[in-house]
Design a protein with these regions (language model features):
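Active-site and adjacent substrate-binding regions of carbohydrate-active enzymes
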Residues: 2-508
Length: 508
């Protein structure tokens, strides 16, 4: 591998065009490099990520690799992370043998949008990006619009870029404000926060009511965009004018429309993913984001009731196509902990065979159970759950098929199997088809009991007398008469949490 590439080296291209429904894999960069360091017997950088691992990502069918926490952080936030007793108890629960060096500080308390020197700097990232691009893998990085680390240079050079407070604010809400020493004296500055929680004490809040701050951030965004193919924007809804005013009582001009337009003016195919909550996903999509987090589907899957899931999936594709579907990420508990072994495959099939961006997290495919805080640089050793691993490998094979990457998706009605049978309400079913004539039916009994229904299929099946349903993810196989399918639908009787993804083929 060449070591001569410099920072901002353009990725070799053009990359293969993205499908309508791509897949993303989130990597906890610092934690993974710590593991590599133990293997190599030296501090690993981005240059040490083996090509074999990049090949594996390509083989698994991912389109985006999101490297979490690559930017430079500093000693101020690290000290706060190490001294905060609440956070420290969380770290101790994750790592029973916790050491000080395991706490580099939050990767979201950024002192500068340059690649951390411990990871090899900007040049190492450029070399990794080239290696990814050789495999048609796109690189996604973080952008944190809401706040900066306390020792970011802007705090000293442009204090007006941050939300200022008063002595009264500090006395009233000491959890949301702090004193900062500046060249012209001490100033009270707000911690970064959202309106529903106390401030993050390792950050300072950016002031979107200041047009100069917005302009500076757009400058950072367009510069970062030269180093990657996409950005995941942390807590993107916090800087919407209505949210910013509710949090801080300050009026601001819209940021995202001008920011996303500035990026697209230079990089038309650049991908923007918004971390979003509070039903603001559509708002952010309309302001230039390709995708927004779909926390609502996650929450409804967690609640384990099928009807609210169907209602959510009944939204128009102009909305659904631009949602990022996930079962876990660095903020949420591990899926193997949240969902029991029986429920996990059912939740995964609904999540990842729905339209949108398929968002996977490092460790999820192996059934890891311990969430790793973004303040930590090391994770616990955990065994692989071979059953979950086998399931995900089979699911990822299906997700590489053109039928579900570029095909047409539609929700299917599930009718009562007989009068008085209410268990049809426990199903989630949908279909995929494409111009080549391929058809797939996904059926999930999302309930802790057996359920029956007639799934109404959306196709004219008169071309054959009988059709075969073959489960891509299991061993089930059913032959059904076309007349019965057209008149009554496909009768299914599934055990608790049973699910399948069935390819339809003509028999005669």
């Amino acid at each position: 591998m060449s070591q001569t590439l410099t920072a901002n080296q353009p990725a070799p291209g053009p990359l293969r065009a993205l499908p309508r429904y791509p897949s993303l894999y989130q990597v906890n960069t610092r934690v993974w490099l710590t593991e590599l360091s133990r293997t190599l017997g030296k501090r690993a950088t981005l240059d040490d990520i083996p090509n074999a691992e990049l090949d594996r990502w390509q083989t698994l069918g991912f389109d985006f690799i999101w490297l979490l926490s690559v930017w430079q952080t500093g000693p101020a936030a690290q000290r706060i992370s190490r001294e905060n007793p609440h956070w420290r108890s969380e770290f101790q629960a994750t790592l029973l043998d916790l050491q000080e060096d395991d706490i580099p500080g939050s990767g979201f308390a950024i002192t500068g949008y340059t690649v951390h020197k411990n990871l090899g700097g900007d040049a190492a990232l450029a070399r990794l990006r080239q290696r990814l691009a050789q495999r048609d893998l796109r690189l996604m990085l973080d952008f944190v619009p809401n706040h900066m680390a306390p020792d970011h240079p802007w705090v000293q050079s442009h204090a007006d870029y941050f939300v200022a407070g008063t002595e009264e604010d500090l006395q009233r809400a000491p959890q949301n404000y702090t004193r900062v020493a500046l060249p012209d004296g001490e100033r009270i500055v707000a911690y970064g926060r959202d309106p529903y929680f106390s401030g993050w004490p390792d950050t300072l809040q950016l002031n979107y009511a200041n047009p100069a701050a917005q302009a500076a951030l757009i400058g950072e965004l367009t510069r970062i965009a030269t180093q990657c193919d996409g950005l995941r924007c942390d807590m993107a809804m916090l800087v919407l004018p209505e949210v910013f005013q509710r949090t801080w009582g300050l009026r601001s001009q819209p940021f995202w429309p001008q920011a996303t337009a500035a990026i697209r003016a230079q990089f038309p195919d650049f991908c923007l993913l918004a971390e979003a909550y509070w039903d603001l996903e559509w708002t952010l999509q309309q302001q230039g984001f390709d995708y927004a987090y779909d926390k609502r589907l996650y929450d409804r899957l967690h609640a384990q009731a099928a009807r609210p899931i169907r209602e959510h999936l009944s939204a128009g594709l102009e909305f659904q196509d631009h949602l990022a579907r996930f079962l876990e990420n660095h903020d949420e508990p591990r899926a193997a902990t949240t969902f029991s072994p029986e429920v996990h495959p059912a939740a995964a099939i609904i999540t990842f065979l729905a339209p949108g961006l398929r968002f996977f997290h490092q460790g999820q495919l192996e059934g890891k159970r311990k969430r790793i805080s973004p303040h930590l640089g090391r994770g616990p050793d955990e065994p692989i759950d071979t059953r979950i691993q086998a399931f995900y490998l089979r699911l990822l094979e299906l997700l590489q098929q053109p039928l579900v990457r570029d095909g047409r998706w539609q929700l299917l009605p599930c009718l009562s199997a007989w009068e008085g049978n209410w268990t049809s309400d426990c199903f989630v079913a949908f279909a995929w088809d494409d111009p080549r004539g391929e058809r797939l039916v996904v059926v999930v009994n999302y309930a802790p009991h057996a359920s029956q229904c007639n799934v109404r299929l959306p196709w004219d099946l008169s071309a054959a007398k009988h059709w075969r349903f073959t489960d891509w993810l299991g061993d089930d196989l059913y032959d059904r008469a076309a007349d019965s399918l057209s008149e009554h639908g496909w009768y299914v009787d599934l055990a608790p949490w049973q699910c399948g993804a069935y390819l339809l083929t003509q028999l005669d």
